[in-house]
Amino acid sequence: MTTQRSSGLLQRLVQGSLVKQILIGLILGILLALVSKPAAEATGLLGTLFVGALKAVAPVLVLTLVMASIANHQHGQKTNIRPILWMYLLGTFSAALTAVVVSFLFPSTLQLTTGATDITPPSGIVQVIHGLLMSIVANPIHALINANYIGILVWAIGLGFALRHSNQTTKNLVNDLSDAVTFIVKLVIRFAPIGIFGLVASTLATTGFSALWGYAQLLLVLIGCMAIVALVINPLLVFLQIRRNPYPLVLTCLRESGVTAFFTRSSAANIPVNMSLCEKLNLDRDTYSVSIPLGATVNMAGAAITITVLTLAAVYTLGIPVDLPTALLLSVVASLCACGASGVAGGSLLLIPLACNMFGIPNEIAMQVVAVGFIIGVLQDSCETAINSSTDVMFTAAVCQAEDARLAKSALRS
């Protein structure tokens, strides 16, 4: 009888909600880190394997899905990419503006020391744009190997349009290939609880949070900005699209996309998770197969917050006065920098010197600010990725649902 009960419990755990399984993995990871540090460090391999599997399958998934959706696209069918792109840009700018307001209300200062990183940041916005343009014309094999999603998108779109003129057998083959890759992705995602367990246990065992206490106020400002954007600004933008209570959708995206992104700390690795959630929400495949990988490269609200908050912290530390027009200009610059973050090694942190340059802050000091960013990266990068990645699904779903509602109203009127 006891054996039957235990096997029944195990079966419910295995076949139950993935979110609940991830929560169990999270709790077990914390407990293991508290009980045995060496064992927790050893489980880091599970997390590394999970993130590696997601990163490996994501480029192929994007290529096949986009190629298949465009190749099989019916003439006259609407994909809603333009309004989604506008929401991405508006969301990123709103996040930067929020960070400016919060930084004005709660100014933070830094303890600057000697530079702690030898990574070379881009010298200006021209170099960022140059990097993005070079990503567009990248070799397709190199783009797949290096997970260059801008290059992958360009090649997938080009091949998709070319395959529109092929016979139906070829189109079916491309579609079947896309379905096969999607099946592998679903298989990988089922291992998320084990991966999260390994990531949480090893992170707590190796780094802990003791190094973060010295930057408590800065972290509170950063995470506070991200919380405001996630729970106030984004729901407002979603409401303007769907014209009803946005929180069921917002909380679903945060729970099923944001949690995974928080622990993997990779928008690229979270693309398969987002694709799976879009399918679960019954969104238009032609739309989300393009908007999700596009969002992973240009929808960077979290990055805009990081760039703005750390730049203003450096400004306050050095006693540089900031007026309202300059703060607004910083919001624009931070938004542009954030959109280019995917094309820069080191992401948003390495674009801080570019924003600091607005205030005449020397590169040596700006790189010290970057070093602070790396110190708080355990939380900063996790929260940033969670808000970036969950917003990709959120805005895609909002636009798709708004379009479905519009079509339903039109059908009723006619």
Curated annotation (Swiss-Prot):
InterPro entries: Na-dicarboxylate_symporter, Na:dicarbo_symporter_sf, Ser_Thr_transp_SstT. It catalyses: L-serine(in) + Na(+)(in) = L-serine(out) + Na(+)(out); L-threonine(in) + Na(+)(in) = L-threonine(out) + Na(+)(out). Keywords: Amino-acid transport, Cell inner membrane, Cell membrane, Membrane, Symport, Transmembrane, Transmembrane helix, Transport. The chain crosses the membrane at residues 16-36, 46-66, 84-104, 143-163, 180-200, 219-239, 300-320, 332-352. The keyword Plastid does not apply. One of its GO terms (biological process) is serine transport. This is Serine/threonine transporter SstT. It comes from Citrobacter koseri (strain ATCC BAA-895 / CDC 4225-83 / SGSC4696). The gene is sstT.
